UniProtKB/Swiss-Prot annotation:
Keywords, sorted A to Z: Ribonucleoprotein, Ribosomal protein
NCBIfam families in UniProt: PRK00596.1 (NF001861), rpsJ_bact (TIGR01049)
Species lineage: Bacteria, Bacillati, Bacillota, Bacilli, Lactobacillales
Xref: Gene3D superfamilies: Ribosomal protein S10 domain
PROSITE patterns (alphabetical): RIBOSOMAL_S10 (PS00361)
Stretches of the chain forming a coiled coil according to its record: none
SUPFAM superfamilies in UniProt: Ribosomal protein S10 (SSF54999)
A Pfam family hit: Ribosomal_S10
UniProt-listed HAMAP family: Ribosomal_uS10 (MF_00508)
Protein name, UniProt field: Small ribosomal subunit protein uS10
Length: 102
């Protein structure tokens, strides 16, 4: 291939599904003969939302909700055409966002 590296960035709300998806990608890439660096855990984004429990008054009574976005980075170095074909056919769990840069 002309490009020497494929960078895959994974995002998910649950870290277990993210780790299984990363494991599938790493296993597929190593099986087809490419060199893999990662999965590298990136910092987790944490979004915190505070709402008032009551509808009209009692502003001191609040509730907080949090949403965490876990991220992983995988570099595939010197991929072959067989590696790219295998990655295109790979079935990943739902709930995992995949960004690929060539």
């Amino acid at each position: 291939m002309a490009n020497k590296k494929i960078r895959i960035r994974l995002k998910a709300y649950e870290h277990r599904t993210l780790d299984t998806a990363a494991g599938k990608i790493v296993e597929t890439a190593t099986r087809t003969g490419a060199t893999v660096a990662g999965p590298v855990p990136l910092p987790t984004e944490r979004s915190l939302y505070t709402i008032i429990r009551a509808t009209h008054k009692y502003k001191d009574s609040r509730e907080q909700f949090e949403m965490r976005t876990h991220k992983r980075l995988i570099d595939i170095i010197n991929p072959t055409q067989k590696t790219v074909d295998a990655l295109m056919k790979l079935d990943l769990p739902s709930g995992v966002n995949v960004e690929i840069k060539l």
